[in-house]
Amino acid sequence: MSDLKSRLKETSNWMSSMFNIIKDPTSESASFSNRVNSVAPPPRRSSSSSSISFSELTNSNENKTTTTTTTTTTSTTATTSQPPQKSPVEQNKEELKKLLQQQLAEMKLKRQGKNSNINDSNNSNNNNNNTDKNKNDNKKEIIKNKKIKEEEESEGEEVEEEEEEESDISDSEDNNSSNNNGSLNGDYDDYGDEISESGSEMDLINNKNLNKEKRKKQEEDLQFSTFDFSSGKAMPTYLMNKGRKTSKKELLEKAEEKERILANSKRNGTNKELADTIRWSTAFDKVQGIKVKDDPALLRKSIKKVEKTKLKSAREWVQRKKEKDEKLKVRIAKREANIKAKIEEKKERRMGIKKKKTNNNNNKSGGGGGNSHASRQRAGFEGKKKFHFNPKKLIN
């Protein structure tokens, strides 16, 4: 039993020395063997920290007797002596209670400070949320106005404006998310309203993108539905050649150059690659259905034909002009003669000279006189008929 007690004391001394090393780093100057063999000094107790040494607890359990001990409290100003009636266990309990009370008071103070900070942060976040709401309302009005403008403007301008709107909305959403994460006790109703508003804006943007895609598809359908290329028929040349039409003289020059290149390649063997490319290009054009005008003889013939038609139209134009001038001259002469005749009539009337009537039987047509043919021309003015229409009866 004595061996066990000695071992227990050694271990308790070693443990107490280790605790003292942790508390007082100055005790490290002593050697380890002295620290193990020596009895552990009583632990220092301050107002801020208190702990029970393992050796004191074991001694109190073995003896089970109340011993009076004097504890010294170190302070900066003065030393005080405690009443010697209390046991170390009771003292430790009281000190622990004091420490707990101090810690609780500190925690309360910290919580009060945190609550004040939280309230300040909540107020700032609420203000930010209100400003964000106003911004979102303004953005909605801007989006509505822009819709009306976008319908009138071109599609390119629509795309630019929508990209700007998307960037603005993404910035506002980032700000909202940062503010909501920073606030611990924010208003959840306001947060829900902001989410619904941002969601509605995103829905509008998605609908716009869908409408754009539909428009593009419709345009593509219009472009490729006007002509059915699935039939395998070649596209006509008047649709292929949208630019300026090349004249026949230019085509003749090109055809002559091609002939010259091909003839040189056959004779001398020069420019074989160029000749092959010319042949392949003409072959591909013919396969595609394009009219290849590379025959110089036919081109010369067509040029002569065009020149002949031009000469013919020029002659006809000159003749027409001559006839027009002659007719104009006749009309002018007739007009001048009529004007002169009217002037002479006026003069004769003033002089009192009466115009003699010319009796031309051929010109008479009414009153029963005159030619039978002239009397038949106007019905109702023939006068009395001296003959019948049937000449056979008259002969009989």
Curated annotation (Swiss-Prot):
Renumbered to this chain, the Low complexity biased-composition regions fall at: 46-55, 65-81, 114-131
* Keywords (A to Z) from UniProt: Nucleus
| Keyword Transferase on entry | no
* Composition-biased stretches (Acidic residues): 151-174, 187-196
Residue spans of biased composition, Basic residues class: 385-396
Report which residue ranges the record marks as coiled coil. none
MF-aspect GO terms: DNA binding; RNA binding
Its GO biological process terms?
A: ribosomal large subunit biogenesis; ribosomal small subunit biogenesis
Subcellular location, record wording? Nucleus, Nucleolus
Record has Membrane as a keyword? no
Region listing for Disordered, in residue ranges: 26-225, 341-396
- Composition bias of kind Polar residues appears in 27-37
Tell me its family: Belongs to the SURF6 family.
Explain the purpose of this protein: Involved in a nucleolar function.
Return the PANTHER family for the record: SURFEIT LOCUS PROTEIN 6 (PTHR14369:SF0)
Q: Tell me the protein's name.
A: Surfeit locus protein 6 homolog
Q: Which organism is it from?
A: Dictyostelium discoideum (Social amoeba)
